[in-house]
């Protein structure tokens, strides 16, 4: 099994994806890496964080092929990495409630790392075009009740395979049983 790299979302850390990791371990998957980045203030641009991710992958992951499971903002960082810095063959990218089409909440932000998450931002349009043209094997999970990526449909990629889960909030969608099942069934293919 190719390794799985976890990337957390804005203001979070490694605890955010532990339930997913625990589920996958129970299913016999044990090859994991965790990218932890400082994002508490939204000061860094996505490109800068994607460069840090690229360095992390280069320095820590020996395997040639990897799968990425990225939560919320982590999904946008992963796409930025794939567009500009890809140094490994990413077989599959799973984004969980990532603001592919922006979030209305970002309209209130002025920090560089959050301004790029506004609906119709230049960055998100560029990443959408990149995903369309590069045919990345992408899987997106979203909930219509997401108040962080608002409205919730903005968290689905227009390309690849989508899974709607009826979790009551943004964080519950990461830990929803249907999310675990969707990831597992598609990662072992």
Enumerate the predicted regions with their spans.
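Serine-dependent carboxylesterase/thioesterase catalytic core
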Residues: 4-8, 15, 25-37, 43, ...
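Flexible, glycine-rich phosphate/dinucleotide-binding loops
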Residues: 13, 41, 102, 147-148, ...
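C-terminal catalytic-base region of ester-bond hydrolases, centering on the histidine
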Residues: 133-189
């Amino acid at each position: 099994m190719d390794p799985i790299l976890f990337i957390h979302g804005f203001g979070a850390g490694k605890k955010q994806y532990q339930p997913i990791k625990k589920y996958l371990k129970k299913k016999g998957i044990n090859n994991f890496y965790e990218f932890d980045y400082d994002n508490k203030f939204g000061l860094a641009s996505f490109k800068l964080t994607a460069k840090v991710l690229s360095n992390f992958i280069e320095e820590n992951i020996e395997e040639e092929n990897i799968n990425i499971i990225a939560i919320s903002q982590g999904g946008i960082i992963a796409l930025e990495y794939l567009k500009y810095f890809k140094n490994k063959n990413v077989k599959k990218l799973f984004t969980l409630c990532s603001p592919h089409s922006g979030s209305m909440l970002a309209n209130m932000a002025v920090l560089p790392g959050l301004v790029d998450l506004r609906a119709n931002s230049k960055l998100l349009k560029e990443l959408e075009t990149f995903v369309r043209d590069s045919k990345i094997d992408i899987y997106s999970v979203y909930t219509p009740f997401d108040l962080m990526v608002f409205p919730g449909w903005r968290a689905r990629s227009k390309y690849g395979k989508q899974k709607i889960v009826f979790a009551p909030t943004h964080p519950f969608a990461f830990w929803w049983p249907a999310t675990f099942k969707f990831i597992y069934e598609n990662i072992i293919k």
